[in-house]
From Swiss-Prot:
Enzyme active site: D68
Binding site for Zn(2+) 1: H64, H66, H141, D212
Cofactor field: Zn(2+)
S-adenosyl-L-methionine keyword on record: no
Name this polypeptide is given: Ribonuclease BN
Assembly, per entry: Homodimer.
Molecular function terms from GO: 3'-tRNA processing endoribonuclease activity; exonuclease activity; zinc ion binding
Phylogenetic classification of the source organism: Bacteria, Pseudomonadati, Pseudomonadota, Gammaproteobacteria, Enterobacterales
InterPro entries hit by this protein: Metallo-B-lactamas, RibonucZ/Hydroxyglut_hydro, Rnase_BN, RNase_Z/BN
Cofactor binding, per record: Binds 2 Zn(2+) ions.
Family according to the record: Belongs to the RNase Z family. RNase BN subfamily.
Function: Zinc phosphodiesterase, which has both exoribonuclease and endoribonuclease activities.
E.C. no: 3.1.-.-
Pfam family, one: Lactamase_B_2
Amino acid sequence: MELIFLGTSAGVPTRTRNVTAILLNLQHPTQSGLWLFDCGEGTQHQLLHTAFNPGKLDKIFISHLHGDHLFGLPGLLCSRSMSGIIQPLTIYGPQGIREFVETALRISGSWTDYPLEIVEIGAGEILDDGLRKVTAYPLEHPLECYGYRIEEHDKPGALNAQALKAAGVPPGPLFQELKAGKTIMLEDGRQINGADYLAAPVPGKALAIFGDTGPCDAALDLAKGVDVMVHEATLDITMEAKANSRGHSSTRQAATLAREAGVGKLIITHVSSRYDDKGCQHLLRECRSIFPATELANDFTVFNV
């Protein structure tokens, strides 16, 4: 999996940062997939500065209905139609997302020439496509807001081909059945159980993408043990009370959560427009003083998961 940050500013855009949007490139050999998390104003323009085609976009996850996470959605949906894209698209989001999209399209006389499904979610598992599952967790914000935990299913362990050959199993289609954990019967009547020749499963990757939030009970469960946690760091330590009063988090709170949850890497984003490049580096240093494995997302920064 690969994360591409299209917008990293909180509330309003700046000269160097657009408002929130994150691409997740799933990079699976047998299944293409491009997911978008939040869609602030100007997201489709940001997308033009990447190598990704909107036609590959098949799922959009909206954390909440504040404009800096949402106002780019109608334009992206319409441009997708005007480009002749016919691939289906599914939008997941809190209550009200359906009304917002349908109203924007209706009032502007717009439509989509592709199947568009809108799923209004609550807390819990919202998707399992056979390769990975997505679970929504409620966060602490003035509007209904969710964070998303994306977990790949474990992959089968490697097949011990050498041991199978030694047991008289010819390479070919039988290996595929054994790789799937099935039991086969050889011509001499022997039964071979694939599970006996498989290494331990390879754990799938896990990723937590937070929407806007102050400290909350669900945060630890959302982030527990993930390889990468994406979390807002809207304000620095000295402005923590102000951040919390508006449903946001400070650098200290983001980094402390990462440490307590045992995550592999913390990526901070959604930084206040009050911070210039020097100020953003200060935010990064504050986080690293608590959780050293912290990175700062800038627009168009790419991270592997």
